A protein has these predicted regions:
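Long, contiguous binding/interaction regions
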Residues: 1-64
Length: 64
């Protein structure tokens, strides 16, 4: 399993997390946080390596 951390504006990260969950991935979300420069949250993904490689290759084909 691979684990990634994605940070960003709360709304954008939340939307991404929703899409990933609908695609069948395991997603854990942090509580929203605020620091001097931004407000956001983090999502943690537990991904199967084969699924990740397939997803990356499919996206590379879409965006040459």
């Amino acid at each position: 399993m691979l684990e990634f951390r994605i940070s960003g504006e709360t709304a954008k990260v939340g939307c991404l997390a929703d899409q990933l969950e609908r695609a069948g991935y395991v997603v854990r979300r942090s509580k929203p946080y605020r620091n001097r420069d931004e407000e956001g949250c983090r999502i943690y993904l537990e991904l199967d390596e084969d699924k990740v490689m397939g997803w990356m290759l499919a996206n590379l084909e879409k965006h040459p």
